[in-house]
């Protein structure tokens, strides 16, 4: 121990190691050693997916096997919208048209995520089986500066539904030409002209958009404007909404009768740490294939993040009649 070791050193032959002063110093050294050992143990735990506790560590380790945790997902509902009175050869419901509902005394807004046009049938203007998403549309822009080596394109909200994310690149502030980029699902087939973007979860549960390096995916240029358009959600709170009213207008008309086809459902928060630990190695082993039962289970869970349980079996497991 420390007392025995120090008492055997020539420099401390005249010291009384039973004295209160020396005992206090030895206690400090012992405590320091204990805490260093504890910190080293905790640090070692965070180095492995199985034992990591911090979300940032789990996300980083999952990234090493090419797995991106799923974002929050917006609650969705399906409705029929009968607009009356209305006129014209056609009627267009603009993207972002708002519908309101109330769940447990709290008001929420739903929006449609694409322009929808219809023509009247026997004079009736009806949008059938319209899918609406809970949340509000937000827009964020970055101007690319290649001289800033630390520049990042982070979506500044932690409840974004990345499935609704639209990424566009405007040439410059003086050139309004824009190109829409798509989410890269892999690197196969990518080249220097591929207009794709990549996603990764970063600190605070937010998501970062990044682009190719000019070899795997087209690189952004100095002065380009990155436009991020997305829905920010209230996670699972609006699930169960049953009735909706039109908050905005449809083609300038504000009177509408709304029938709910399916109640609001599917809203979720960020993928849990336990789910990331389970899915990351299986997603890596599946390699986007659908061959084994485990492959199918992994793919289904990645497509339907709100699924509470997935059961898969192959014909080889079925009992012979």
Language model features with spans:
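Signature of Asx- and small-polar-rich beta-strand/turn repeats characteristic
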Residues: 1-321
């Amino acid at each position: 121990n420390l007392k025995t070791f120090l008492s055997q050193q020539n420099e401390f032959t005249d010291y009384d190691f039973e004295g209160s002063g020396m005992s206090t110093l030895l206690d400090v050294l012992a405590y320091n050693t204990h805490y260093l050992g504890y910190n080293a143990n905790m640090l070692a735990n965070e180095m492995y997916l199985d034992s990591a506790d911090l979300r940032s560590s789990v996300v980083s380790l999952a990234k090493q096997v090419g797995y991106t945790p799923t974002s929050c997902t917006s609650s969705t509902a399906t409705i029929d919208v009968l607009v009356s009175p209305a006129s014209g050869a056609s009627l267009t419901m603009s993207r972002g048209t708002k519908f309101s509902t109330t769940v447990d005394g709290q008001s929420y807004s739903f929006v449609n995520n694409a322009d929808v046009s219809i023509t009247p049938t026997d004079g009736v203007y009806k949008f059938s089986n319209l899918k609406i998403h809970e949340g509000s549309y937000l827009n964020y822009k970055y101007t690319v500066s290649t001289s800033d080596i630390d520049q990042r394109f982070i979506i500044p909200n932690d409840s974004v539904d990345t499935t609704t994310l639209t990424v566009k690149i405007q040439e410059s502030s003086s050139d309004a030409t824009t190109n829409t980029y798509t989410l890269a699902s892999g690197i196969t087939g990518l080249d220097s002209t591929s207009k794709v973007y990549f996603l990764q979860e970063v600190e605070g549960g937010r998501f970062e958009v990044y682009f190719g390096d000019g070899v795997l995916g087209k690189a952004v240029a100095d002065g380009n404007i990155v436009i991020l358009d997305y829905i920010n959600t209230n996670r699972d709170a609006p699930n169960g909404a049953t009735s909706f009213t039109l908050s905005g207008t449809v083609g300038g008309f504000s009177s509408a009768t709304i029938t709910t086809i399916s109640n609001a459902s599917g809203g979720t928060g960020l993928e849990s740490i336990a789910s990331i630990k389970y899915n990351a190695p299986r997603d890596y082993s599946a390699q986007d294939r659908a061959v084994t039962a485990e492959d199918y289970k992994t793919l289904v869970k990645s497509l339907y993040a709100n699924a509470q349980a997935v059961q898969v079996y192959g014909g080889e497991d079925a009992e012979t009649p």
